[in-house]
Design a protein with these regions (language model features):
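Conserved structural position within tetratricopeptide repeats
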Residues: 39-40, 70-74, 105-108, 125, ...
Length: 175
């Protein structure tokens, strides 16, 4: 599926700068308003929907997070970040089996495809999102009462953690 870009290069840079600034200052409510406005202005930009999903999640608005993620999935179902954010939204709404299905879509992909494919952002990012998918799958398994599977995934997640590779989860959360 070819991505239809509706934002100009300058608009994308301004968007990314605003996004980074509001995130780094934890201005989630302001970011939510900004993203809703951008979504109205650019309805075919899946990245806006997936960022809105993430923002809703940070605000504890899990139903809205899932809805925004579903919209992003309809626009671009093959972007690993979109899939991951959708899995997080499903997990947050206690849809653990559905989240596992999405996480498996990420985990089955080759690391080089994630890193350097159409939506890739490099090897460190690919390693990060794939490893965090392992941990999130483990937590879903745990919630489904599948302790052995969860334990194996957590051990694998911890073994693959590396300096310089970001994780959404601290070691304290994992252990």
């Amino acid at each position: 599926m070819e991505r239809k870009i509706t934002l100009s290069k300058d608009d994308r840079m301004n968007f990314q700068n605003t996004l980074d600034n509001l995130k780094s200052n934890s201005k989630w409510q302001v970011l939510k308003t900004y993203l809703i406005e951008m979504k109205i202005k650019y309805p075919s930009e899946y990245f806006i929907c997936t960022e809105l999903s993430n923002t809703y999640h940070m605000l504890g608005m899990y139903k809205e997070s899932e809805q925004a993620s579903m919209e992003a999935m309809q626009l671009e179902p093959n972007d690993v970040l979109v899939i991951y954010n959708y899995a997080v939204a499903l997990y947050s709404n206690e849809k653990f089996s559905e989240a596992i299905v999405q996480l498996n879509r990420i985990l089955k992909r080759k690391i080089n495809t994630i890193a350097y494919g159409v939506h890739g952002e490099g090897m460190k990012w690919a390693m990060s999102i794939k490893n965090d998918s392992l941990y999130l799958k483990a937590i879903c398994q745990l919630n489904l009462g599948k302790l052995k599977e969860a334990y194996k995934l957590i051990v694998k997640h911890l073994a693959q953690r590396r300096r310089g590779v970001y994780s959404d989860f601290t070691k304290k959360q994992v252990t």
